[in-house]
Amino acid sequence: MMRQSLQAVLPEISGNKTSSLRKSVCSDLLTLFNSPHSALPSLLVSGMPEWQLHNQSDKHLQSWYCRQLRSALLFHEPRIAALQVNLKEAYCHTLAISLEIMLYHDDEPLTFDLVWQKGSWHRTMPQ
């Protein structure tokens, strides 16, 4: 009987830990993107406004950017098991990216959307 009541409690504890893990990863990613001394290569973070002005429609460069960002994030965030990086918008003064993240010990994907505006990254809610 004791085992049954313990099993009923475990999913809730796991759910709270998963929620906490997701919030922690999102917070750490936003900090990583906005840190003046970010571990991410500067072109991937602060170099974006200059890149957008000249190459916003270059599909090869957009693909390169996504690959480089994916590689850097996987290197710097060990809690990510799988990651897909997509450009949602690439305009003159706005860049929007979407990160589809699978975390270790989490069965549901996490979508993390960011937009570059006015010199910094901001989190947006997925649509």
From Swiss-Prot:
Coiled coil: none annotated. Inhibits RpoS proteolysis by regulating RssB activity, thereby increasing the stability of the sigma stress factor RpoS during oxidative stress. Its effect on RpoS stability is due to its interaction with RssB, which probably blocks the interaction of RssB with RpoS, and the consequent delivery of the RssB-RpoS complex to the ClpXP protein degradation pathway. Keywords: Cytoplasm, Stress response. Belongs to the GpW/Gp25 family. IraD subfamily. GO terms for cellular component: cytoplasm. One of its GO terms (biological process) is cellular response to oxidative stress. Transmembrane segments: none annotated. The keyword Cytoplasm applies. HAMAP family: IraD. The keyword Cytoplasm applies. Signal peptide: none annotated. InterPro entries: Anti-adapt_IraD, IraD/Gp25-like. It is found in: Cytoplasm. This is Anti-adapter protein IraD.
